[in-house]
């Protein structure tokens, strides 16, 4: 398994729309495994393939307290949503930033699992929020897109400044 590099906002590659996975094979399973390892190492609860510059519809999530209940979603589709909720969301692609984002409280999705079998999942609370957040990544949408232009621009400038500092450290 490998740790993958997580792209950071405002990297344009985060805006690419992910393509459906056409065939479940060992390569896709390896990508999902590497994504899980990357997510755990970064102490995140979800990661979309877009965030690691792989533009396929793959999401990994683990919102369990013991961090031993990974969920792999291949080609997820939102079937139903209801209610309203929201929390202060963070994102591995926008480190150090959080914002309250409105989301559906309950959702039902359909996806393929690691073996390529189709399944339905009904989720609420944190799992529902996390799935919606990660599915946004698959269409090139970030949580900052829900914010006012002023707040989004402030975060973008902060991230660009951080990127320049990190580039100087790497030299």
From Swiss-Prot:
- Catalytic residues, chain numbering: 134
EC assignment: the record states 3.5.1.88
SUPFAM superfamilies listed in its UniProt record = Peptide deformylase
Q: Respond yes or no to whether keyword Iron is given for this record.
A: yes
Recorded hits in InterPro entries, A to Z, give: Peptide_deformylase (IPR023635), Peptide_deformylase_sf (IPR036821)
Q: Which residues form a coiled coil?
A: none
Q: Name one GO biological process term.
A: co-translational protein modification
Residue positions annotated to bind Fe cation are 91, 133, 137
- HAMAP family in alphabetical order: Pep_deformylase
Q: What is this protein called?
A: Peptide deformylase
Protein source organism: Hamiltonella defensa subsp. Acyrthosiphon pisum (strain 5AT)
